[in-house]
Amino acid sequence: MKIGIIGAMEEEVTLLRDKIDNRQTITLGGCEIYTGQLNGTEVALLKSGIGKVAAALGATLLLEHCKPDVIINTGSAGGLASTLKVGDIVVSDEARYHDADVTAFGYEYGQLPGCPAGFKADDKLIAAAESCIRELNLNAVRGLIVSGDAFINGSVGLAKIRHNFPDAVAVEMEATAIAHVCYNFSVPFVVVRAISDVADQQSHLSFDEFLAVAAKQSTLMVETLVQKLAHG
């Protein structure tokens, strides 16, 4: 099995990258892909860049060039569920765009023409992630993750997301674009991210302060998940 892992920022991939043995770097389309073995398992780790276009471009290049069997999207996210704290884990059961609106033509808010309203994560990957969470004794929430090209840092943007997606547990900027590409390629995916901030008016300050905490927690989760997927 070859496992594809995608993070947007240097801070989100550096700990995983340092753990890859026999590492080689591939530069394509402004993205960097690091291939090798993570604890004996073949992996391809993509640093995509921030935002939906960068994530979709990178995911496409990763799938075409490295042919992974599954995709794990890792990194940080803003917490929407009331129980979430910095360092807690969110696991997707679905991903949706929070900034797409073609409702004038009868589509659901967040749905693009020709696409489902949401992109479902793979049940087996979800189950494996939840098993890792139990083993590591981490606090986690599973649910809807929403994505858009905005850092949510204020009451207006937050209120709009809560209105349109009352069940969303986290918000970030890449996951749904990655899920969209995986849907088109029929490749199973799951989003496993750690909370770096709670989406509110102080979220930019929390993000800067706690990104390293989120990166450490998400790296721990991904490393454990890769082991479980490879060896059961």
Swiss-Prot record:
One of the GO biological process terms: L-methionine salvage from methylthioadenosine
Keywords: Amino-acid biosynthesis, Hydrolase, Methionine biosynthesis
Entry keyword annotation includes Hydrolase: yes
Known EC number: 3.2.2.9
GO-annotated molecular function: adenosylhomocysteine nucleosidase activity; methylthioadenosine nucleosidase activity
Subunit structure: Homodimer.
HAMAP family: Salvage_MtnN
Protein name, UniProt field: 5'-methylthioadenosine/S-adenosylhomocysteine nucleosidase
